[in-house]
Regions:
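A generic structural signal for short
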Residues: 41, 159-160, 183, 222-223, ...
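Non-catalytic C-terminal accessory region of glycerolipid acyltransferases
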Residues: 2-6, 141, 177, 188-307
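Membrane-anchoring hydrophobic helices of lipid-metabolizing enzymes
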Residues: 2-131, 170-174
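Short glycine-/small-residue-rich flexible loop motifs, especially phosphate/cofactor-binding loops
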Residues: 53-54, 136, 172, 218, ...
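Short, flexible loop segments at the rims of nucleotide/cofactor-binding pockets, characterized by
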Residues: 98-104, 180-186, 223-225
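Catalytic core of membrane glycerolipid acyltransferases/transacylases, capturing the structured
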Residues: 118-188, 215-217
Length: 307
């Protein structure tokens, strides 16, 4: 086991070393390469083309094929920009580089501050909108003149480990680039144990909640015109521990800039069922997707249980 772990660490080190020269380039140079990557994904590799087109067509049955095709193209461009932004982010060992680029801004940090002050802990339900690979810099995205509780030692991000251990190590270290000496990531399989054992401590938990659920699921109802099951584990924990629950939306409002907005789902999750919390989350997510359709991860097999 130790030998395999060492092999993965070496592989991850090689990948990150190859990324390093590109990571130090100015962000605007990365967007120059993004155009080529988008073309490569769409026109040459046809990356998950069937999944993307099928998801879009079923989610927007009233739209024309021309609209589906354009939105798919916009998504490929967005995906390419996410890739180059993640590479650039790996070079942000100096948080000032993040703040100077102002690539992400918190629109209403006062809402999460209020929730944090008035709740045992806060459960923030995230999505696959925007660029979640930039969330390792959340501590540095508040440009408003108000207090924000998103700080190292307070924020704990729940993530799902990749099957490929080398790439899992690459992304794990990448997300920690601005704060490499700080811990704060929880693997999804250990979420229940960690939160239960730290229930007397005040934390903010960030959970990406819109993937296809393999366990702890419920029937959400109709989401994007399709019957959908949703992951309910985070909502169940929040309900049992009487946590405040927020939705976190991330919008790519222009190239090189994302806005993060929090919306209150409930102040005390014990007053709602986990199913009600999850339904409200999906209502907010659907609203965001309809406003900026290309901004979601259409290449994900979200409805793999539907024939």
């Amino acid at each position: 086991m130790a030998k395999k772990e060492g092999k993965h660490n070496i592989g991850a080190g090689i990948v990150r070393a190859l990324m390093y020269p590109f990571a130090k380039m100015p962000l605007r140079w990365h967007y120059f390469f993004a155009g080529f990557i988008a073309w490569l994904l769409r026109a040459v590799l046809h990356y998950r083309q069937d999944v993307i087109y099928t998801n879009l067509a079923k989610s927007f049955p009233d739209k024309s094929y021309a609209w589906i095709r354009k939105t798919a193209g916009d998504f490929y461009r967005h995906l390419a920009e996410m890739i180059v932004e993640a590479i650039w982010f790996s070079g942000c060992r100096n948080p000032e580089r993040l703040r100077k680029a102002r690539i992400v801004e918190l629109v209403n940090p006062e809402l999460i501050q209020e929730a944090y002050e008035n709740s045992p802990s806060v459960m923030v339900l995230d999505t696959h909108c925007g660029n979640w690979e930039l969330l390792g810099g959340l501590f540095f995205y508040n440009f408003k003149d108000c207090e924000c509780p998103i700080k190292p030692g307070v924020l704990h991000v729940v993530y799902k480990a990749l099957k490929n251990k080398t790439w899992d190590k690459v992304f794990y270290e990448n997300r920690r680039s601005p704060t490499p000496d700080k811990e704060g990531q929880i693997e999804a399989s250990g979420m229940l144990r960690f939160i239960a054992s730290h229930r007397r401590e005040k934390y903010i938990y960030l959970v990406n909640n819109d993937q296809f659920p393999r366990e702890s699921s419920c029937e959400v109802g109709t989401f994007l015109n399709q019957p959908t099951t949703g992951f309910v584990g985070a909502a169940t924990l929040a309900s049992r521990l009487k946590l405040s629950v927020l939705y976190m939306g991330m919008v790519n409002d222009r190239r090189g800039h994302y806005s993060i907005r929090f919306e209150r789902i409930c102040d005390d999750a014990s007053l709602m069922t986990p199913e009600e919390i999850t339904r409200r989350y999906y209502d907010l997510l659907e609203k965001d997707i309809k406003e900026t359709p290309h901004n979601w991860l259409w290449s994900h097999k979200r409805w793999k249980n539907i024939k």
